[in-house]
């Protein structure tokens, strides 16, 4: 999970219990993380780090699910600056779907589920990534 200006540790203790649907989003996050290979995609394009430099990349995807958890629409709402990383984020959500048993309370008046998902690729000597909602 990425939080600006918060050091990474074993756990980030937030008031998660007040988030009604955290279990669903944790499942979504785990499914997407299994598919997301931004570090591999990045290293294939820039194995030495000389092309794109050492700059962390952050993008967000606006996700719309059908009531059964299948993907209806994906939209890159914040670009990372590298199209191939944004494409990888979209691909990973598509491949991870469907997201079974979405809570009824997440459905909007249109019967669809809308949320934004973030992808943070930390570029150091060895790229690392974090996925968050």
Kindly label every feature range from the protein language model.
Residues 16-17, 48-49, 77:
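Conserved short loop/turn motifs at secondary-structure junctions
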Residues 15-23, 80-84:
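Soluble non-cytosolic domains of exported or imported proteins
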Residues 42, 50-57, 110:
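Short loop/turn motifs at secondary-structure junctions and domain boundaries
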Residues 39-49, 104-105:
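Surface-exposed patches in mature extracellular/periplasmic domains of secreted proteins
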Residues 6-9, 47-51:
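Charge-dense, E/K-rich amphipathic alpha-helical interfaces
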Residues 59-61:
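Short hydrophobic beta-strand micro-motif common in sensory/regulatory domains
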Residues 18-19, 23, 27, 33, ...:
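Charged, alpha-helical coiled-coil and linker scaffolds that mediate dimerization/oligomerization
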Residues 1-12, 30-36, 66-78, 87-101, ...:
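Conserved "boundary/linchpin" sites in short secondary-structure elements
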């Amino acid at each position: 999970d990425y939080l600006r200006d918060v050091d990474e540790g074993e756990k980030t203790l937030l008031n998660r219990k007040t988030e009604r649907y955290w279990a669903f989003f944790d499942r979504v996050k785990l499914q997407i993380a299994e598919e997301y290979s931004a570090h591999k995609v990045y290293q294939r394009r820039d194995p030495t780090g000389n092309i794109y430099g050492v700059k962390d990349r952050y993008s967000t995807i606006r996700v719309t699910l059908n009531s059964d958890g299948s993907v209806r629409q994906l939209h890159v709402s914040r670009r990372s600056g590298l199209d191939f990383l944004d494409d990888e984020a979209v691909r990973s959500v598509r491949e991870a779907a469907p997201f079974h048993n979405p809570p009824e309370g997440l459905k909007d008046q249109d019967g669809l589920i809308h949320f934004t998902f973030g992808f943070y690729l930390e570029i150091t000597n060895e790229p690392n990534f974090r996925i968050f909602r």
